[in-house]
């Protein structure tokens, strides 16, 4: 996660896909900077040169290359982008699911006590389900604990780290948006519709996010906090809910 006074972006905890997206971003920026420098250089040459070629009518070879080179650059950007998009949309078997429901102006999480493990033998009838309402924490209490202003909540959602899971996102009133930048996640919460979102945190962490869709007067006071803990402690947390 990011800290106050940090000079860099926060760490991405999305595993190998996050690293691939980070490398792709660096590649795109390298190409963009190279194109910008070349265009500025050619612009300066054309504007400030004292010479001109009066008999220049057309140059087929030049027109060929200034068409082919941008096409090759775009293809070079397209190929890794499509690969990353494919892996981002890849659906894997989840071991745990939870539902995030946006409400004015807090988040409600619904989940069941089952975690898909080789030793799990609970029947569907014996599985207990729970609901957690997560409101923004009072600022005085946040300051006393040294927390983050407008980002901490009274009840954190807890999830297992390094476990493939699925988040089902919806809304009970107006449009919201469930966004966790450190997990590379942003999905709309739409009334009457459930959006499916694969999720996996590669390490134990506390991930902060916010509603990213203007949803009313208290839109800015609708934080999201998910605490990812080791799987064995997560199982103990689920058992303690009973």
UniProtKB/Swiss-Prot annotation:
Q: Which InterPro entries match?
A: CcO_II, CcO_II-like_C, CcO_II_C, Copper_CuA, Cupredoxin, Cyt_c_oxidase_su2_TM_dom, Cyt_c_oxidase_su2_TM_sf
Q: Which GO terms describe its cellular component?
A: mitochondrial inner membrane
EC number of this enzyme: 7.1.1.9
Tell me the residue ranges located in the Mitochondrial matrix compartment per UniProt: 48-66
Please give the chief subcellular localization of this protein: mitochondrion
Q: Superkingdom, according to UniProt?
A: Eukaryota
Give the subcellular location.
Mitochondrion inner membrane
Quick one: which residues bind Cu cation A2?
A: 211, 213, 215, 219
- Chain ranges sitting on the Mitochondrial intermembrane side read 1-30, 84-242
**Residue numbers binding Cu cation A1:** 176, 211, 215, 222
Q: How does it sit in the membrane?
A: Multi-pass membrane protein
Q: Where are the transmembrane segments?
A: 31-47, 67-83
Catalysed reactions, semicolon-separated: 4 Fe(II)-[cytochrome c] + O2 + 8 H(+)(in) = 4 Fe(III)-[cytochrome c] + 2 H2O + 4 H(+)(out)
- Principal EC category: translocase
Needed cofactors: Cu cation
Cited PROSITE patterns: COX2 (PS00078), COX2_CUA (PS50857), COX2_TM (PS50999)
Q: Supply one GO BP term.
A: ATP synthesis coupled electron transport
**Molecular-function annotations in GO:** copper ion binding; cytochrome-c oxidase activity
**Could you give the cofactor binding note from the entry?**
Binds a dinuclear copper A center per subunit.
Query: What does the UniProt keyword field contain?
Result: Copper, Electron transport, Magnesium, Membrane, Metal-binding, Mitochondrion, Mitochondrion inner membrane, Respiratory chain, Translocase, Transmembrane, Transmembrane helix, Transport
Binding residues annotated for Mg(2+), in chain numbering? 213
Keyword Ribonucleoprotein assigned to the entry: answer is: no
Q: Which family does it belong to?
A: Belongs to the cytochrome c oxidase subunit 2 family.
Subunit composition? Component of the cytochrome c oxidase (complex IV, CIV), a multisubunit enzyme composed of a catalytic core of 3 subunits and several supernumerary subunits. The complex exists as a monomer or a dimer and forms supercomplexes (SCs) in the inner mitochondrial membrane with ubiquinol-cytochrome c oxidoreductase (cytochrome b-c1 complex, complex III, CIII).
Name of the protein in its database record: Cytochrome c oxidase subunit 2
